[in-house]
Amino acid sequence: MSDKTKKRIDFNKHFKIANIFSTCAIIFCLSVFFLKGLNLGIDFKGGTLIEIKSESGDVNIKDLRSSISNLNIGDISVKNFGTKQDFIIKLELSSKNNSENVNLIKNKISSYFNDQVSFRRVENVGPKVSSELINAGILAIALSLSAMLFYIWIRFEWQFSLAAILALMHDVIFTLGIFSLFSYEINLSIVAAILTIVGYSMNDTVVIFDRIRENLRKYNHFNIIEISNISINETLSRTIITSLTTLLALFSIYFVGGEILNGFSFAMIVGVIIGTFSSIFVATPFLKFTNVTQKTVNKEEK
């Protein structure tokens, strides 16, 4: 082994611990998911969204939330939207007359701000539409996973595609489990975040897989474990720089972007961290169980 390949971090000795961690984490996330469920937003369970602007200055969200909760018309969510004068109210779908509930909220808001308020929009999502959105969200995630599987299968071999899909499923389950644990609201923006996570994680995995394929041709006398370790080290600087710069932007959105963007940015932060982890400690070690060798690469070239 050359000096270049000697001075490396030995990821091999950490694979077992990482696999134990991943297995326990997935079991925990699945348990939380099935026992606690997901906190679905009005996009998926129906309800009403009201966007409002205060004409009398900044809004005290806590005080406003306390005032509206006295109406006793169901679960109501109040969040800042953009500036400190803008906010949105989300009212879950109920068996009562929805228009009456909306009017009650409007009257309460008008009274709270002494009529110095403007109602910018009112959107209703019925049970049929919410059901269609749930199906569309599940279909979008399933199709993206299938497309990734097909892409990896064509570009590499079936062994690589299985490893990649395993890592992607790991990332999605972990992210949904964390959302269930902390009761973050699941809406369409979270579905978009999950699809972005799938693409980000796949990109990380493909970079490592491409280097593994290249090194399988280069180091004929090494096994897949040694090749994997060399390949991870060779792409490590790229992985760290990409992940850190992405996380820097996401943390900025989380802390500065306002409450309305917290869910999306939180999902992306979790996804980037776990996606980077899975590309190294889930997808790559799995290759040894699929008997990837130099012959696999040579067969691919023919």
Language-model features: locations:
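A structural signal for conserved, well-ordered secondary-structure elements
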Residues: 1-302
